[in-house]
Amino acid sequence: MPRLLIAASGTGGHLFPALSVADALPAGWSAHWLGVPDRLETTLVPERYPLTTVNAGGLQGRGLKKVVQLLRLLAASRDVRRLIRRNGIDVVFTTGGYIAAPAILGARWSGVPVVLHESNAIPGRVTRLLGRACTQVAIGLPAAARRIPGCKAIVTGTPVRNSFLQTQTLPDWVPQGPGPLLVVMGGSQGALGLNRMVRPLLPMLLSEGCRVVHLTGSNDPDVNSIKHPGFAERPFSDAIPALLQHADLAISRAGAGSLSELAVSGTPTVLVPFPQAADRHQDANAACAAALGAAVIVHQHGPSEPTLRQTLWRLLGPRLRSCDSAADPLVSMAQAMGTLAEADADQQLAALLQGLVR
């Protein structure tokens, strides 16, 4: 029975692709999860896989602080090596983040192959520092390859949840009607800035017949400020697969996970990169979609600036005016977004892991 150690921690962007890969493995495989205390995995993972946690963190400090962090990394790597030996692990898979460093070092010290998945167009610090130590680096976007010279890189795409690959029905709370459906979602971080940019424009779109679903996040002080039969507002929703499949247009941040979900759904999108993202990696992610004609990039700006308003009217205007498809830019955008998709990314990664087991 092949044994896999999955090191994925912190956010849905790290956890959900790893869960998809674990689900794609054939019967007969067993998986053990490596995470960090008090993170999302401690609630999502234990009901499905045995979970071991280690204290892992970054190396951003200086002087004594950095020495302490380095010692903590070495201790965590030692713990991972013990875990690998105790459980007879055959291969390690990690999706990056803080937990990836001790997972990679522990695997190499144990002589076990390790696969690192990098979802962003600009690889993270762990990928840049330790990618060469990995047996294989799987990348979600082709643009990442040139930024990690010396790594054994292969393009697999970023796995999405199975619900995105199945036809979904819109829930009853979504506004009904003939007008185009606009879905606004800010993701787990950065929703507030996006909301402040988008919300002043929604009354105009609603008055023209557009239907709008706005996923605001949990900390927006201006929720319930818009009342309209064509408008629905929620902090979060489990119906994102259905929303994206049926949306005429989405407004979204440009995280790698969101971009993969938009791609497999074929959803034309206005991408607003989160300006505080590390290394501005969301700008690079968005550029990959824009280069294909699948998305339009609008950088975050104040509500009085016209850029987003002009973009939305250019994209949605033909459908609001019932023009023929030849004048509709969303048709070609949807087709282009589909070319960005790697719907079988989980299967590709599962096959890669299987090929590394002796």
From Swiss-Prot:
GO terms for biological process: carbohydrate metabolic process; cell division; cell wall organization; lipid glycosylation; peptidoglycan biosynthetic process; regulation of cell shape. InterPro entries: GlcNAc_MurG, Glyco_trans_28_C, GlycoTrans_28_N. It comes from the Bacteria. UDP-N-acetyl-alpha-D-glucosamine binds at T11, G12, G13, N120, R161, S188, Q282. It is found in: Cell inner membrane. Its EC number is 2.4.1.227. Keywords: Cell cycle, Cell division, Cell inner membrane, Cell membrane, Cell shape, Cell wall biogenesis/degradation, Glycosyltransferase, Membrane, Peptidoglycan synthesis, Transferase. Transmembrane segments: none annotated. It is an enzyme of class 2 (transferase). Belongs to the glycosyltransferase 28 family. MurG subfamily. This is UDP-N-acetylglucosamine--N-acetylmuramyl-(pentapeptide) pyrophosphoryl-undecaprenol N-acetylglucosamine transferase. It comes from Synechococcus sp. (strain WH7803).
